[in-house]
Amino acid sequence: KGTDKNYDLTLVDGSLDIAKAKINQVTGITADHRTYDATTNATLNTVTAQFEGIVVGDQLTVATATGKFNDKNVGTAKHVAINNISLSGTDSNNYDLVKNTAQTTANIGKANINSITGITANSRVYDGLTDASLNIANTQFNGLYSGDQLTVATATGQFESASTGQNKTV
């Protein structure tokens, strides 16, 4: 009803559209620190994600996201690009994600070489010393990732004693 007695107000049924709200960006995604594994893959933690533009009381979570370090090498506070962020949660159908990328940092620590094999001592003539010259041409590093290369920079060896003998321990 209107407030003017000179008019009758007639309401007509109609339809309206309610547009989705926009999440401008997702922040708070972190990457786990990890040990070197010859890849740029980063494991993400989305539990602390925050959604810029969410209506108070709505429930959103990160459905998917991928993380990549800029390179595979060891380092601290390395840049991690976060891509392909998508939303889930009870109220996710009410939102469009404007920016599906983010960034963070994480550390890559050194990997361990489990063992080194293939280094042999060269036979020699008795000289009263225990020094052994080593052949490193066939060195193998157990724990080395495919595609990576390591070499032995220096190696020293000592015979268990200076006396002559066969199959002596070095």
Features from the language model and the residues they span:
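Short loop/turn motifs that initiate or flank beta-strands
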Residues: 1-170
